[in-house]
A protein has these predicted regions:
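Short, basic/glycine-rich phosphate-binding loops at helix/coil junctions
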Residues: 13, 84-89, 141-148, 222
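Flexible, glycine/proline-enriched loop segments at strand-loop-helix junctions
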Residues: 92-100, 151-158, 230
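A short aromatic-anchored loop/beta-hairpin motif
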Residues: 2-116, 120
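Surface-exposed, charge/polar-rich loops and edge strands
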Residues: 4, 108-111, 115, 146, ...
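Beta-strand elements within well-structured catalytic alpha/beta cores of enzymes
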Residues: 10-15, 58-63, 150, 171-184, ...
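Internal, conserved structured core segments that host functional sites
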Residues: 105-162
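Solvent-exposed alpha-helices and their adjacent loops that cap or buttress functional pockets
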Residues: 4-5, 52-53, 139-143, 170
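Long, well-ordered alpha-helical scaffolding segments within enzyme catalytic domains
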Residues: 37-45, 159-174
C-alpha cells in the first residue's frame, strides 16, 4: 500500500506582456519574444507541469485586469473570455482558452478570506480577461488544469493584498498553485534611461521579496512606493499589486527570480518571481 503525499504548490508572479501580443507574435519577435519565451518555457517548469508528480491540481490566478470594491472570485464551472483590449488584429478576438473553472475551490477561497475578515464575493458569470488567458495559453496550452480567477481590490492597498495572499496560502498545501499576472514595470509615459530605472526598481523589489521571514517581506513590500523609481515604473500600481498577493502566499519559502530585457514598448527590465518553484 502506498501513501499519497500532497505536494506544496508554488506561488508565482509573471509578467503577462502587452495585450494579446505574446500569443500573436513568435518567440523570435524582437519586442515580444522574451515575454513569450518566459511564459512558454520558464513558467511551466517553475509550476512543475512536465511531471505528473509535480503538476498542480488547480491554479488560482490573480489578475491585474479585474478591479472590484472587494475581492471577486470567478466561481463558474466554466467562463467565457473577455477580450478587454482594443486595436489589435482580428485574430486577437478569436483566441480561445477552454480550461474549466472550479466552484468548489472558489467557495473555499471565499471561506478562507471570510475567516480573515477580508470581504469577498463570488462571480459565476464574468469572463476571464487577458491577464488570465494570454499567459495561460502559453503556460499550459493543454487547458487541462482548472482555474479560479481573482480580482484585485480598488485602491491597491499593499497591506490588504499581502493579507489576501496570506489567507490564500493554505491552498498551496492542497497542491493548488497561486499565480499573479501583472507587470513589474507598467508605464506608458516613461522618461530617461528606462532600463536603468526599471532595473533599480526591480532590484529593490527582489530585495524586499527575498526576505524568508514573511513578516519582514510584508513590511518591505508595504513600503514599495519608497523604492527607487517606484512611481515612474508604476504611475498606477494595479499591475504591481498581484505581486503583493503572491508574496503574501509565499509563506517562509525562499525566492527564485528571473529578470529579462523587454522592448514591447520601450526597453525595460522585467522581473518574475516564484516561491516553492521547481528549479530549472
Amino acid at each position: 500500500m502506498t501513501t499519497s503525499v500532497c505536494r506544496r504548490a508554488p506561488a508565482i508572479f509573471v509578467n503577462h506582456g502587452a495585450g494579446p501580443l505574446p500569443v500573436l507574435m513568435p518567440v523570435t519577435d524582437p519586442d515580444h519574444g522574451t515575454a513569450r519565451a518566459f511564459l512558454e518555457q520558464v513558467t511551466p517548469a517553475w509550476l512543475g507541469l512536465n511531471d505528473v508528480d509535480t503538476r498542480p491540481s488547480a491554479i488560482v490566478l490573480v489578475t491585474a485586469h479585474w478591479e472590484e470594491s472587494t475581492v471577486a472570485i470567478s466561481s463558474g464551472a466554466s467562463h467565457p473570455l473577455l477580450y478587454d483590449y482594443g486595436g489589435f488584429p482580428k485574430e486577437a478576438y478569436a483566441l480561445t482558452y477552454n480550461a474549466k473553472g472550479s466552484p468548489a475551490i472558489a467557495h473555499k477561497i471565499h471561506a478562507l478570506l471570510t475567516a480573515q475578515n477580508i470581504p469577498s464575493k463570488l462571480d459565476p458569470t464574468r469572463g476571464w480577461d487577458h491577464g488570465l488567458f494570454v499567459p495561460m495559453k502559453l503556460i499550459n496550452p493543454a487547458e487541462d488544469i482548472p482555474i479560479v480567477q481573482l480580482s484585485v481590490v480598488r485602491g491597491s492597498d499593499p497591506d490588504l493584498h499581502f493579507r489576501i495572499g496570506e489567507a490564500l496560502a493554505p491552498l498551496r498545501d492542497e497542491n493548488i498553485a497561486i499565480l499573479g499576472s501583472g507587470m513589474s514595470y507598467h508605464s506608458f509615459h516613461g522618461r530617461g534611461n528606462l532600463v536603468a530605472q526599471s532595473k533599480a526598481f526591480n532590484d529593490a523589489l527582489v530585495k524586499a521579496c527575498a526576505h524568508v521571514d514573511v513578516q519582514a517581506r510584508g513590511e518591505a513590500l508595504r513600503a514599495w512606493e519608497a523604492m527607487p523609481g517606484a512611481r515612474e515604473c508604476h504611475p498606477r500600481e494595479e499591475h504591481l499589486i498581484p505581486l503583493h498577493v503572491i508574496a503574501g502566499a509565499a509563506g517562509h519559502d525562499a525566492l527564485t527570480s528571473k529578470d529579462i530585457l523587454s522592448t514591447m514598448f520601450e526597453p525595460v527590465r522585467l522581473v518574475s518571481m516564484g516561491w516553492g518553484v521547481q528549479e530549472l
